[in-house]
């Protein structure tokens, strides 16, 4: 028996949860949660926006802790997680599942990152109503914004979603879902005609209400010009030079987990980094200070 005058036992010291999972009572971040007004403010002030892909709770929480502002649950998971040869086979249910995983991780770690979910191939092509149903599914899974690929033909869909309260990130240049139609993973907008088309489509998407625009494998000079011209739609580049409003990389690429030939626009941030979080922090610093990407090395 415990003596009546015995001191009360000390509260148990919280211990790490098993299997590397996130503690449900993590210390809230001092940073304010990201929002569309804040992202527009960063763009207006010339502060670079950082984005990485993530597909599960732990990597998403680590990315947020490293200072990454936007997390993209990309359909690239089809290639880096599922082993597919393109993103075409990724389903809405797969995207919904991974979006929910990432959202859970961000919530449990009191994260501040802005979460974007990719609408996969075939989920917004049939009609605006189809796009709405599927965008709602990703928003209900925890996304703050949905992303869809395509040029001017998507403008009406973008407007339809925005009018119904769903923020949209558009995607021009190399659009991996249409890689077969494009003839492979090729730089887009190299000719005068192609550049003019990209400019027109970018303005159409901004006018439709797109709040962000990914530019993939677009010549650096063209990307910089588009960024200057789009006054209220920040551009996020991947293989598009350092003149965009922000940068995004696929998580596995920037951690050097690519067993094949590394894309030209990628830097392995694990080189010299003490940890995955350290690599992500190095990425954030490099984007913020303009040392990544380097046009002569990582762009066209």
Swiss-Prot record:
Protein name as it appears in the record: 3-methyl-2-oxobutanoate hydroxymethyltransferase
Cofactor comment text: Binds 1 Mg(2+) ion per subunit.
CDD domains for the chain: KPHMT-like
Domain of life: Bacteria
EC identifiers of the protein: 2.1.2.11
Main location: cytoplasm
Family membership noted in the UniProt record: Belongs to the PanB family.
Residue positions binding 3-methyl-2-oxobutanoate: 75-76, 118, 147
Catalyzed reactions: 3-methyl-2-oxobutanoate + (6R)-5,10-methylene-5,6,7,8-tetrahydrofolate + H2O = 2-dehydropantoate + (6S)-5,6,7,8-tetrahydrofolate
One GO process term, biological-process aspect: pantothenate biosynthetic process
Organism: Polaromonas sp. (strain JS666 / ATCC BAA-500)
Binding site for Mg(2+): 75, 118, 149
Assembly and binders: Homodecamer; pentamer of dimers.
GO cellular component annotations of the record: cytoplasm
Example of a GO MF term: magnesium ion binding
Active-site residues per Swiss-Prot or TrEMBL entry: 216 (proton acceptor)
Residue segments, region Disordered: 1-34
InterPro entries in the cross-refs: Pantoate_hydroxy_MeTrfase (IPR003700), Pyrv/PenolPyrv_kinase-like_dom (IPR015813), Pyrv_kinase-like_dom_sf (IPR040442)
Keyword tags: Cytoplasm, Magnesium, Metal-binding, Pantothenate biosynthesis, Transferase
Composition bias type Pro residues, residue spans: 1-12
UniProt function note: Catalyzes the reversible reaction in which hydroxymethyl group from 5,10-methylenetetrahydrofolate is transferred onto alpha-ketoisovalerate to form ketopantoate.
Annotated localization: Cytoplasm
Pathway terms, separated by semicolons: Cofactor biosynthesis; (R)-pantothenate biosynthesis; (R)-pantoate from 3-methyl-2-oxobutanoate: step 1/2
